[in-house]
Amino acid sequence: MAVNVDLQTDATLQVDISDALSERDKVKFTVHTKSTLPNFKQNEFSVVRQHEEFIWLHDSFVENEEYAGYIIPPAPPRPDFDASREKLQKLGEGEGSMTKEEFTKMKQELEAEYLAIFKKTVAMHEVFLCRVAAHPVLRKDLNFHVFLEYNQDLSVRGKNKKERLEDFFKNVVKSADGVLVAGVKDVDDFFEHEKTFLLEYHNRVKEASAKSDRKIRSHKSKFLLSLSYLYGFFLKVSELFEKTRKIEARVAADEDLKLADLLKYYLRESQAAKDLLYRRGRALVDYENANKALDKARAKNKDVLQAETTQQVCCQKFEKISESAKQELIDFKTRRVAAFRKNLVELAELELKHAKGNLQLLQSCLGVLKGDT
């Protein structure tokens, strides 16, 4: 799996993506479920789902008030194979201008690149489902069970232009409201600390993700471009360049898998945690406003019952969110620390291995050039 999120597996409900099929404009995921829960008709079953259905499930969690106190697992990114397909298409068009050996080698490399993106896409969608299945509350959601068990198309479509525009305006309003909520000092020191930390953490991960992408692009393009130019001039070391190029490609792939994907995932999940704190902050503001309204109603002896009811509803909502939010944020910390530690250690080990391989190649090449071998 591209992103290790340190999930606690539960034998009563296990979900994975057992197969996936890439078509021209979509990917079909076979979602496989094993469960001993009484809610399901069978103990083991599979359904075929598309990306839009994953987004529908994610949005149904976000829009459900009952889950306001939980970190909603981030939605998987949309599959994007356009760049790889375009390269394969251009390769086909230029087949006549290169040797059979060159064409075969280029085709194999592009197919490997396409396969890597495909596997990463499948892994990201599987992580989302595993996170939901591991969550003690979200795993009981009716929509989630429908997603897993209903063996027909869910008739879910992507959002049209009007709906996307509405989402845009909602986000603008939410951003403005977020500034107001962020300015309110929390009554609980734990949440005040988490709010400050998450804002800084999210920005740092965002910056690291952008730098990681630039570093990987550098491995994939500039270094390889330099080698292609030098290749024609230094025939004696052409074999070294070819082997080094392959090692650099593996370095880029490892960095993409172990670092870039990890940063992108936790960029999305830290945003989900920030959204949780926003919902709690909004509930706190509503509760404080309800208290003020109740004081005014009592002072004027007007609409007191209505004000008391509103105050009680706001109080219950705030307390309910606070109760679950604290444990969610503690679990989030445990998860992310374990994931970063595991992936960074594995990446360091892989890069040491590749560096040793490069060193051996250079030493071997120097020996050849000096006439030692």
What are these regions (language model features)?
Residues N160-T373:
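C-terminal, extended alpha-helical scaffolding domains
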